[in-house]
């Protein structure tokens, strides 16, 4: 009974969300609703009720914690005038999921202000730096192992970002077991890029990304950069004119070799990284990354949405609420049985 009550409360909360969005659409004469993640559906329903356009922007691969949305593809298809996915591997994946419609691409955008100059308090010593939260998915332990294999006298390995406690402990244990020196964790910083020196090499060994915004920030700041070849990183690497170097995820020999080569030729690497910034800034402009979206915003036709008035009438009914609760209860019982 407690679970049933929780489900009813959740469904009622969703209904309130949809109603609130509908009121916003009406009060503000909204012509287009954009859902900026696959993980929400309320905007899609509100747009259908009010007969306005709805775009779905999908940043997530249909796997892992987001694998559930493979079962929701029909809903996404029905309630979207246009579907957009992060350029590269995700777009290719979703084209297979939606074979009967065009999936448009975009690049995730974040406001980046490249530094006019970088700190120079490096006493002419190179550092290997990695920006981002310390997590299993970010896979920083791979970089720590590579650093151990390199055994570079005087070179520091610096991590800039907060951390998940369990994963930080895993890294600390490895550092202690191997008696590694010159590894530091600076924690969260409002502006980690301000800590970068003109002698630093950035390395991002993440095991999974949708696009790789931290890589984008790195090359836009003119930093020599190495990144792993997970699907999201490859998409960003291709989008940013293949600036930097990419290595096979999990291949420690390849990573150590690449770090060594970049450090050996660092002056030329730095020069090329800085020279690439103007063209990369132009490529990664707001107008460029969202070009497909703005083009479709200007299109007055509702091209793909398949929802009918009959669907809307049903969703407005108490029967729909009952069906939603029954579906949720069924899933709970299935999970209980599995456990």
Task: Tell where the protein language model's regions lie, with residue ranges.
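Donor nucleotide-sugar binding/catalytic pocket of nucleotide-sugar-dependent glycosyltransferases
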Residues: 78-115
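Short hydrophobic beta-strand element within catalytic cores of glycosyltransferases
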Residues: 224-228
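Glycosyltransferase donor-sugar binding loop
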Residues: 131, 156-169, 185
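Short glycine/serine-rich donor-binding loops of glycosyltransferases
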Residues: 212-215, 233
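Conserved acidic donor-binding segment of nucleotide-sugar-dependent glycosyltransferases
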Residues: 241-253, 260-267
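Aromatic "clamp/platform" in nucleotide-sugar-dependent glycosyltransferases that forms part
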Residues: 188, 207
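A charged, aromatic-enriched C-terminal amphipathic alpha-helix characteristic of glycosyltransferases
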Residues: 267-323
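A conserved mid-protein helix/loop that constitutes part of the nucleotide-sugar donor-binding site
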Residues: 126, 133-149
């Amino acid at each position: 009974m407690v679970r049933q009550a929780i489900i009813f409360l959740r469904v009622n909360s969703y209904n309130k969300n949809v109603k609130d969005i509908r009121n916003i659409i009406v009060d503000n004469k909204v012509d287009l609703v954009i859902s900026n993640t696959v993980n929400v559906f309320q905007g899609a329903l509100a747009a259908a009720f009010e007969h306005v356009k709805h775009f779905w922007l999908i940043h997530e691969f249909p796997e892992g914690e987001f694998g559930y949305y493979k079962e929701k593809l029909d809903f996404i298809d029905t309630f979207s005038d246009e579907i957009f996915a992060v350029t590269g591997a995700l777009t290719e994946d979703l084209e297979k999921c939606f074979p009967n419609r065009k999936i448009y691409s975009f690049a995730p955008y974040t406001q980046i202000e490249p530094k006019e100059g970088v700190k120079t308090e490096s006493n002419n010593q190179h550092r290997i730096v990695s920006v981002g939260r310390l997590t299993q998915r970010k896979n920083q332990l791979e970089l720590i192992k590579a650093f151990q294999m390199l055994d570079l006298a005087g070179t520091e390995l610096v991590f800039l970002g907060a951390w998940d406690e369990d994963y930080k402990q895993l890294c600390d244990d490895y550092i202690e077991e191997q008696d590694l020196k010159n590894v530091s964790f600076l924690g969260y910083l409002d502006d980690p890029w301000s800590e970068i020196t003109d002698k630093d090499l950035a390395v991002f060994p993440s095991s999974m990304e949708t696009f790789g915004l931290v890589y984008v920030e790195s090359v836009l700041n003119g930093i020599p950069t190495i990144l792993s070849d997970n699907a999201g990183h490859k998409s960003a690497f291709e989008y940013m004119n293949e600036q930097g170097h990419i290595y096979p995820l999990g291949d420690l020999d390849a990573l150590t070799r690449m770090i060594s080569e970049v450090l050996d030729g660092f002056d030329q690497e730095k020069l090329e990284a800085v020279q690439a910034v103007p063209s990369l800034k132009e490529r990664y402009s707001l107008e460029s990354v969202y070009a497909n979206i703005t083009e479709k915003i200007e299109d007055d036709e509702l091209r793909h949405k398949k929802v009918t008035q009959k669907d809307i009438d049903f969703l407005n009914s108490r029967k729909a609420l009952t069906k939603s609760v029954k579906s949720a209860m069924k899933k709970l019982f299935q999970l209980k049985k599995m456990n």
